[in-house]
Amino acid sequence: MSLIEGDSIYNLFQTQDLGIDFASSIVPDSPNKFKKNANVFNNFQQQQQQIQQQNKQSNGLIYNNNNNNNNNNNNNNNNSSSSNNNNNSSSSNNNNNSNNNNQNHNNNNNNQNHNNIQHNNAQSQVYINHNSNGSQQEEQLFSIYLQPEKENELNNSYHDNVNNNNNNNNNNNNNNNNINLNHAQQQQQQHHLPHGQPHNNNNNNQFYQIKNPMEEIYSSNGIVPNQEPNKKVEYMNEPIKQNHYNIVPESIFDVPFGVSSQTMLNVPSTNNANNNNNNNNNNNNNNKNINFKQPIQPNQLIPIPPHSNQNNNISLNNNNSNSNSNPNNNNNNSNNISTQINNLNNNINNQNNQLNGSNNGKKKEEDKSIKKRKFISSTPVKGENGGTTLIPTTDGGFNMDEERHQKRQRRLVKNREAAQLFRQRQKAYIQDLEKKVSDLTGTNSEFRARVELLNSENKLIREQLLYLRNFVTQAVSFSFPKGGSNGTNSPSGVADQFLNSILPPGLNSPLPQGILPAGMNLQNPMIMSAIAEAASKNSTFRQNIQGNLLGTPIPSPQSSLTSNSGNNSPNKPLNNNNNNNNINNNNNNNPSSPNNNLNNNNNISPNSSTSHQVPYLPQNTPPQQSTPNQR
């Protein structure tokens, strides 16, 4: 893993306890990678040679000088963490003071911008592994910690100087040379360190008690390094992973760590952001902050804070100005950060709960309002097939005007539907009545036709009966025999026999009285000849006679009368009681004489109603037949 910016890391870990993981895994990048700015590290290399000489005397201690310039006073305080004896540490401090004074003087005169590599925090403590050959030190480091395919992807981005730790109002830039132990050398020099004794702490840069590097140094941030100094750090603390880290699984990709961490933490950018710089000096220390674009290895822990919707007003920079550095201050700072983070998390949870509660309350109110609605009416809607369906309507009670409008529309629809149904029923009723009237009219016309037919038949029957009655009367009067008191020889008996012979069986009813004169003999050939002559002169009569002779039944007068009375004919039947056939027999002495018969036939009483009751008889009556005596 390559160098990570100290600013982003220290923004996460404000105390020194949380930043001790740089001891074994994080190293500065090589200056040879930046050919354009190769002179930046010249002073650093000179200091490195002096440190190597000093390390031979102090059992391999390594120093990293962090120089801050001042126009008025250049107080170079060398803070040594541990040494074998006080003489060696004091001598090394004196040597470093002399060298640092020269370097600071050159930097102030020439306005050089690269006095040291500042990662936005003066407390960024960089540990360098020591080797006997100082020239090969950086090559070995980068061969171990950098991958060859990622070396060409390193970038150096320059930002304005952000010196968060120059808090001296006295215009004094105290250049504190913070000397920290390497992990391997700290194990060798544990018995030489003063327990719990901090050194010169003008800018809150201090050494602290180191009892056990596996317990004390790494206990605060949960980082457990390997025993070998040249291997990477393995993070084993699971709760810290859950709270502050995400693991990138089995992938390598490049992320500018400084930019990504600042955007995730809502930390303001470092451009022109001098948060705690209260110096009134005129020194333009344009120290370039070099941000490295580094590859993220698989299973690497990326610091990600808890999500927050509010502006995190937590100052993650070191704002300790002119304060006495004590171990308790570090604990207080860490406690403050943890409490602030907890407060933010609580606020977020409260807001989420409020939002969820408000949403749930609204849903419950809507559900209650829906449950309170009742189906107060049903709206008839005309379907596609011509039928109507009833759709239930709900009363929400939200808007009175809208509700009134809906009621009015429902009422109009009901009225229209009722009117339509009434018109349909009325039309069906009228059509039924019209059909009945048409049927009755047809039957009435049929009955009228039948009545006319019956009237015409009745008229024809009357004409035939009246016409035949005259002929029969005349024939009987001519053939009435003389004397003969027997019943068989009487005219009535003969007429009955003749009629019975002519009429079909079942119609042999006795003839009415008064049709034939008494004593008329129908067996007389003269009577038969008279009937035949009359029939020859009248075609209708001839047809009737032929029908009778051939066996065709001729209706009797009674049947014709009953048929006329059954048909309710308006024309009343003839009155058979008229004495039209009553012949006045003046000659009672000679009733059988032919002359008297002729006279009797001709002398018809004038009171007879023949001419009145039968006005439609034909005028061309058959002529009277002559008697044999007249021949």
Curated annotation (Swiss-Prot):
Would I find Metal-binding among this entry's keywords? no
Q: Where is the composition biased (Low complexity)?
A: 155-206, 271-360, 563-609, 618-631
Q: Which organism is it from?
A: Dictyostelium discoideum
Under InterPro entries, the record lists: bZIP, bZIP_sf
Give the protein's biological function. Probable transcriptional regulator.
**Which Gene3D superfamilies does the UniProt record give?**
1.20.5.170
Top-level taxonomic group: Eukaryota
Coiled-coil ranges per UniProt: 35-62, 328-366
Q: Which family does it belong to?
A: Belongs to the bZIP family.
CDD domains assigned: bZIP_HY5-like
Span list, region Disordered: 46-117, 154-207, 264-406, 546-631
What is the protein name for this chain?
Answer: Probable basic-leucine zipper transcription factor F
Where are the stretches annotated Leucine-zipper? 433-440
Gene name of the record: bzpF
What would you give as a GO molecular function for this chain, any one?
cAMP response element binding
